[in-house]
């Protein structure tokens, strides 16, 4: 299975290859804890992705931030390497304005 960093790079590359703006969020002393790892604009839609290694677990604060983004109308997910195809489907759906806001938060 992919490491968290290699999976993160795969996601960023896919976003870039599809013309999406994306930024890797680096938390530090002055930033807000729990913010997802990747923040992106996909065809005008806000997408936030908390990237996890296959055995990783999101913190409660990370889940709260994902929920806050979804409540604000954005798309936010916790993505695992085994959920790569689901994540690609979500990104592809945003690219063509066809998406399901009811998709599970955890993509495994």
PLM regions and their residue ranges:
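Catalytic phosphate/metal-binding cores of nucleic-acid and nucleotide-processing enzymes, i.e., regions
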Residues: 1-108
